[in-house]
Curated annotation (Swiss-Prot):
Specifically dimethylates two adjacent adenosines (A1518 and A1519) in the loop of a conserved hairpin near the 3'-end of 16S rRNA in the 30S particle. May play a critical role in biogenesis of 30S subunits. The lineage of its organism: Bacteria, Bacillati, Actinomycetota, Actinomycetes, Mycobacteriales. It is found in: Cytoplasm. One of its GO terms (molecular function) is RNA binding. This is Ribosomal RNA small subunit methyltransferase A. Gene3D superfamilies: Ribosomal RNA adenine dimethylase-like, domain 2, Vaccinia Virus protein VP39. It is an enzyme of class 2 (transferase). SMART domains: rADc. Its EC number is 2.1.1.182. HAMAP family: 16SrRNA_methyltr_A. InterPro entries: KsgA/Erm (IPR001737), rRNA_Ade_diMease-like_C (IPR023165), rRNA_Ade_Mease_Trfase_CS (IPR020596), rRNA_Ade_methylase_Trfase_N (IPR020598), rRNA_adenine_dimethylase (IPR011530), SAM-dependent_MTases_sf (IPR029063).
Length: 293
């Protein structure tokens, strides 16, 4: 029996009942899959390593499975939901399953790709979410860009996306998402999630990805990103090309690209997949600027 001061998590019966009440069918368009296993939810929250001082932002709370567990471990939870029916039902669910914790919940009815600092009552320190699978990487990067206060991330994504995000330089799956995510700090796999904990059950496995934001040798601001991101994009646009060839468009010519690469102490004959984020930042020439400002 749950303590009255805590939250009663949602199981398969409650998830189906809520969906029927709201006439909600999880849609592929919105990347919706609802977690209906309390043990999985507890595991996600434990992996996030939240403290009682953390202010969590959750993207895509759905019917509230993860949200209910998060409020037990954090100072507050802001749920960003694009579906008005789901957003309207969340407070009702909290009155039913966690009335003593309902004051910790805030809801933002908005597309997560458009959410801004001004939408938040409290700036988040952690992002914990079962991300909509069709936009998981863009949402992850947007949240890290928009909220410099986020210092820890634990997200559930498709297993192959999790592998790509946490890939090391030189591997076949290392690419643009890997480099851009590591711009903020180390990216690691934090576990696997089976198909049967979801409704409806997806066709593929899921994975947990953890990012711990670190104080880097470069500024994690818009000005820096605008210099680094285009170089990363250009380097991976045609993976089989050498950096000299791949970056010739960015720098204006192959010769100019080679000069920039050599100035950054990078072999022009390498391919983009061989460089880590530090190399790309150095190539963008923004390391020195941080010290000057």
């Amino acid at each position: 029996m749950e303590e009255p001061s805590g939250a009663q998590l949602l199981g398969p019966v409650e998830i189906r009942a809520l969906a029927e009440k709201l006439d909600v069918t999880p849609t592929k368009k919105l990347g919706q899959n609802f977690v209906h296993d309390p043990n999985t939810v507890r595991r996600i929250v434990a992996a996030a390593e939240l403290t009682p001082d953390d202010h969590v932002v959750e993207v895509g709370p759905g019917l509230g499975s993860l949200t209910l567990a998060l409020v037990e471990s954090a100072a507050s939870v802001t749920a960003v939901e694009i579906d008005p029916r789901l957003a309207a039902e969340l407070p009702e669910t909290f009155q039913w399953r966690a009335p003593a914790l309902a004051h910790k919940l805030s809801i933002v009815l908005k597309d997560a790709l458009k959410v801004q600092q001004s939408d938040m009552e409290v700036q988040p320190t952690a992002l914990v979410a079962n991300l909509p699978y069709n936009v998981s990487v863009p949402v992850l990067l947007h949240m890290l860009e928009e909220f410099p206060t986020i210092n820890k991330v634990l997200v559930m994504v498709q297993a192959e996306v999790a592998d790509r995000l946490a890939a090391d330089p030189g591997s076949k799956i290392y690419g643009v998402p890997s480099v851009k995510a590591s711009f903020y700090g180390p990216v690691t796999r934090a576990g696997s999630i089976g198909k049967n904990v979801f409704w409806p059950a997806p066709k593929i496995e899921s994975g947990l990805v953890k990012i711990v934001r670190e104080d880097t040798a470069w500024k994690q601001d818009d000005e820096t990103r605008k210099k680094v991101w285009p170089i990363i994009d250009a380097a991976f646009l045609q993976r089989r090309k050498t950096l000299r060839a791949a970056l010739s468009g960015h720098y204006g010519s192959g010769q100019a690209a080679e000069e920039a690469l050599r100035a950054a102490d990078i072999d022009p004959t390498l391919r983009g997949e061989k460089l880590d984020v530090t190399d790309y930042v150095r190539l963008a020439g923004v390391l020195q600027q941080k010290d000057e400002k």
